[in-house]
UniProtKB/Swiss-Prot annotation:
EC number: 6.1.1.11
EC main group: ligase
A single GO cellular-component term on record: cytoplasm
PANTHER family attached to this UniProt entry: SERYL-TRNA SYNTHETASE
Name of a matching Pfam family: Seryl_tRNA_N
GO terms of molecular function: ATP binding; serine-tRNA ligase activity
Chief localisation class: cytoplasm
Subunit field text: Homodimer. The tRNA molecule binds across the dimer.
The gene coding this protein: serS
Catalyzed reaction equations: tRNA(Ser) + L-serine + ATP = L-seryl-tRNA(Ser) + AMP + diphosphate + H(+); tRNA(Sec) + L-serine + ATP = L-seryl-tRNA(Sec) + AMP + diphosphate + H(+)
Keyword Aminoacyl-tRNA synthetase (UniProt): yes
Natural source organism: Methanocorpusculum labreanum (strain ATCC 43576 / DSM 4855 / Z)
Name of the protein in question: Serine--tRNA ligase
Sites where the protein binds L-serine: T232, A233, E234, E286, T387
Length: 425
């Protein structure tokens, strides 16, 4: 969330940012935040004065008694003070709740390089890498191809779990694991620490990682425990150091998470009922960085470069897209998507999301870094995240881009060492 000190000092920046996001409702919230914050600070001063007066009255009563004066008026005043203080405390508590409610929902401040646009149709293509191959035969649907060859079973998964699930079998299961190992080896070699996070998070932690009001509809909730199955390893890695203070010498902290991801809501395009693109459960290798504020834009480009390296080595054509103001969401200050070429759809589709969240998550999670030259000085650190590979979508890319005319699927060369040298599925 935004730091109240920033909103207080720069309301014009917040308002201008909301204008760029075309969010009329939240524009009205800024005045409410400022009014309630002002009320809280005024009543804080007032209560400090009332408490000081209470202490002064005690001294005056003693003086009156010594001088033989009647202290009854002072007793009456002293008796009224606790009620006044409590009334102010109650108003302050409500003001604090209102300020936090809106701050938790106001979006991050966008970087100046985020393009203006109304929705995903106005995202800006930054570059394209690789050339989609020309085909003189009709590609088979990846789901039907996988099912026909015994590499996946969608029908039995629907019986056991419902639509949007799948069994991976045989060499396709091994290919999924090969993708995981290849991505992990690539990222670990760059100094990232591998992390297997908890696959569930409690509500409090989830509320502080993301806007749960928006995100909750896509998540699986465990009712009795007030917990959620994770939608991405980003979330537990972000919450891992909540309420802690880093030393500057320990940053950047670079991690790569390995986890299943669980999503209830599949998206505007609906379920991929016989396929691997939009599903309820998938494995994802996720990059995550905590860093000093002045390093975060450099780190953002590093995360993107890492993901690009993986898809380039896999030989999959892709493009990088700078997400526009109307499509970027609440948490990121800037976000790139990588979209891989899907021949059956004859279009690029999202396979990687790469975000710089600046201080937005660290403010929510109360994660700070101590100044190396001033022990008492602390500031919010920055957090960043990026997909390395989501295996279900990468599998679809391979099944389509490496499919041969006779229905075989060539295994990308970089994955063959993880497949005991196998060249075709």
């Amino acid at each position: 969330m935004l730091d109240i000190k920033f909103v207080r000092a720069h309301p014009e920046v917040v308002l201008a940012d909301l204008e760029k996001r075309q969010d009329a409702e939240k524009l009205l919230w800024v005045d409410t935040v400022l009014e309630q914050d002002k009320l809280f600070r005024e009543l804080t001063v007032k209560n400090n004065e009332l408490r000081a007066r209470r202490n002064q009255i005690a001294k005056e009563i003693n003086a009156y008694k010594k001088e033989g004066k009647d202290p009854a008026p002072l007793f009456a005043e002293a008796k009224a003070l606790p009620g006044l203080i409590k009334d102010n405390d109650d108003i302050m508590e409500k003001a604090t709740e209102q300020v936090r409610y809106y701050l938790m929902r106001l979006p991050n401040i966008l970087h100046e390089s985020v393009p203006y646009g109304k929705d995903d149709t106005e995202n800006v293509v930054v570059k394209k890498v690789g050339t989609p191959r020309s085909l003189d035969f009709e590609l088979k649907n990846h789901g039907e191809l996988a099912a026909a060859n015994g590499w996946a079973d969608f029908e039995r998964a629907t019986k056991t779990s419902g639509a949007g699930f799948y069994f991976l079998k045989g060499n396709l299961a091994l290919l999924d694991m090969a993708l995981q190992r290849f991505a992990l080896d690539t990222i670990i070699a760059k100094g990232y620490t591998p992390i297997i996070p908890p696959y569930m998070m409690n509500r409090k932690s989830y509320e502080e990682v993301t806007d749960l009001g928006d995100f909750e509809k896509v998540m699986y909730k465990i009712e009795d425990d007030d917990a959620y199955l994770i939608a991405t390893a980003e979330h537990p890695m972000a919450a891992m150091y909540q309420d802690e203070i880093f030393e500057e010498k320990d940053l950047p902290l670079k991690m790569v998470g390995i986890s299943p991801c669980f999503r209830r809501e599949i998206g505007a395009h609906g379920l991929d009922s016989r396929g691997l693109f939009r599903v309820h459960q998938f494995t994802k290798i996720e990059q995550f960085i905590y860093c000093m504020p002045e390093k975060s834009w450099e780190m953002h480009e590093e995360l993107l470069a890492n993901a690009e390296e993986i898809f380039t080595k896999l030989g999959l054509p892709y493009r990088v897209v700078n997400i526009c103001t109307g499509d970027i969401g609440t948490v990121a200050a800037k976000k790139y998507d990588m979209e891989a070429w899907m021949p059956r759809d004859n279009e690029y589709r999202e396979v990687v999301s790469c975000s710089n969240c600046t201080a937005y998550q660290s403010v929510r999670l109360n994660i700070r870094v101590r100044d190396a030259h001033d022990f008492e000085s602390k500031q919010w650190l920055h957090t960043l995240n990026s997909t390395a590979v989501a295996t279900s979508r990468a599998l679809r890319c391979i099944l389509e881009n490496y499919q041969t005319e006779d229905g075989k699927v060539e295994i990308p060369k970089v994955l063959r060492p993880y497949m005991n040298g196998l060249e075709y599925l």
